[in-house]
């Protein structure tokens, strides 16, 4: 959820400057929360295998870094921008613009600060998504939440659609989830 929300926020910042921005991802959107976020934000996502990276002037990574294995960016492609809250990885050091704040609990906090600095009031869908990014990555503010995360949480909670937040957090799970859960429980052994 943090990455989806951050991608939407970065797109909002780019669009504010009249810069076209596509959100590209590597595979399927699997988690029910991410599917709900994409739907709620009305995001058009493009799969990496459906675009030519050469057609972009710049590439940004949010909530991930090059060489970490959790993003689809080919190793021979260097992003221009990396914004993340995880500890810095060596390949990130050569990127032109980096904002790595490993003391933060969520990258959504960083993007919230960017929106505030640009004097952009996030619309309720974006505020809701960023709020959920913080909630998700900090496990309801119980894991690694810092002052900046708390400030962003309170700022966004005043602008978010709380009913939609609840629907995103507790959305329906697909039928295969229950089949897999049944299989796992049926095969579980106590030692």
Language-model features, listed with the residues they occupy:
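Short secondary-structure capping/turn micro-motifs that flank functional sites
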Residues: 30-31, 54-55, 131, 173
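Hydrophobic/aromatic residues located in beta-strands of well-ordered beta-sheets
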Residues: 21-23, 80, 130
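Residues at the C-termini of beta-strands that transition into short coil/loop
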Residues: 27, 84, 103
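Anionic-ligand anchoring segments at beta-strand to alpha-helix junctions in alpha/beta enzyme folds, i.e.
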Residues: 1-53
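A structured phosphate/pyrophosphate-recognition subdomain
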Residues: 1, 8-15, 19, 90-191
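Short, solvent-exposed polar/charged micro-motifs at secondary-structure junctions
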Residues: 33, 56-60, 177-178
């Amino acid at each position: 959820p943090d990455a989806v929300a951050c991608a939407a926020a970065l797109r909002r910042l780019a669009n504010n400057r009249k810069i076209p921005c596509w959100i590209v991802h590597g595979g399927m959107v699997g988690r029910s929360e991410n599917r709900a976020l994409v739907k709620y934000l009305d995001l058009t996502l493009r799969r990496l295998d459906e675009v030519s990276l050469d057609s972009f002037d710049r590439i940004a990574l949010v909530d991930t870094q090059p060489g970490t294995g959790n993003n689809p960016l080919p190793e021979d492609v260097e992003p221009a921008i990396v914004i993340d809250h995880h500890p810095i990885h060596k390949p990130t050091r050569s990127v032109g613009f980096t904002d790595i704040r490993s003391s933060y609990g969520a990258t959504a906090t960083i993007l919230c600060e960017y929106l505030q600095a640009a004097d952009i009031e996030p619309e309720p869908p974006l505020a809701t998504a960023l709020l959920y990014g913080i909630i998700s990555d900090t496990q309801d503010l119980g894991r690694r939440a810092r002052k900046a995360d708390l400030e962003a949480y309170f700022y966004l909670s005043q602008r978010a659609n709380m009913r939609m937040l609840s629907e995103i957090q507790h959305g329906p799970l697909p039928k295969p989830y229950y089949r897999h859960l049944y299989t796992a429980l049926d095969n579980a052994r106590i030692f």
